[in-house]
């Protein structure tokens, strides 16, 4: 019914990479599903040098309020690469869905193309570095609408804003049910015994995910409870910093036989699924966060989760009901120890978490929200403001 209202329209998604990171993962699941409803949805990526993506990584960190040294040369490189993509990238959608800051400057084409333009911001810009935000705001102001993942992420804008939380696909390789044999085979592959509780964090190798802090929290837990840590992550083609973070994490872990640092290539979803299902507790100790869908992935598997109270995580973790929210290294360690000491409580949290995800963070709800957004932009004359 909703999809029929978009008959004949082309929706063009543009971001900075086909693989690695939450945006690419969401698009890879969402676009085929929308297509099955008869809506013409396509996906393109911008091109950029390693130097360009170093600049956009600085922007990303600065928008998350991390201190970064950003120079006039950085802004000039961003403008130069943006102009090159404006000149070379074919833009043809009736609705152009631009994801995050990297391709934001493509809005310059609106003057000659017209059409409807949406800026989909997947990150928290509520307390941005003001210099970077002052640079990006003139681009944002030209869009027809902006979409944020959580109410706390947004800021005052001269355009319409919409709230659409991201989602997981329960039938994807990362979330579907797995046989015990499959789970065991992954543990054997990576040399992870099941002789003690397994504490796991799944995330990109990114300073904002605080992998070194995860190791520190684990060491505090291990003083009281014998357990092992698995940190499985990937790198992304638009994140040049990730290899540097990986090296630091490996150095911090040293030769501790109870710490397993795994580099999992993008698309290795069944193994990630298996690692989550084999875990006793899932951790997401982010310093800053977009939405943090690894939390919903874990909750869907009925796993007890300890996660930082940042970004979109508090929308997924209702403290002491669907998981435990934590603050800092000691707080994370305390929450993990609490769950290890109370397995029935941990199990109860996991069951509540699955129900919460079922009703709020599955792809079917996400799909409906996007269709309603597209229809709104395409039929604005029918909207009545009360």
Model feature map: region roles:
Residues 280, 302, 309:
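A short alpha->beta transition loop at the rim of the catalytic pocket in nucleotide-sugar-dependent
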Residues 319-330, 338-343:
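Conserved acidic donor-binding segment of nucleotide-sugar-dependent glycosyltransferases
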Residues 233, 237, 241-274:
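Nucleotide-activated donor-binding/catalytic signature segment of Leloir-type glycosyltransferases, i.e.
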Residues 338, 345-360, 366, 372-376:
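A short, well-ordered alpha-helix in the C-terminal region of glycosyltransferases
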Residues 273, 296-300, 314-315, 321:
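Short alpha-helical segment that forms part of, or immediately flanks, the ligand-binding pocket
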Residues 12, 187-209, 215, 229-230:
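Conserved donor-binding/catalytic core segment of Leloir-type glycosyltransferases
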Residues 304-307, 317:
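Short hydrophobic beta-strand element within catalytic cores of glycosyltransferases
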Residues 287:
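Aromatic "clamp/platform" in nucleotide-sugar-dependent glycosyltransferases that forms part
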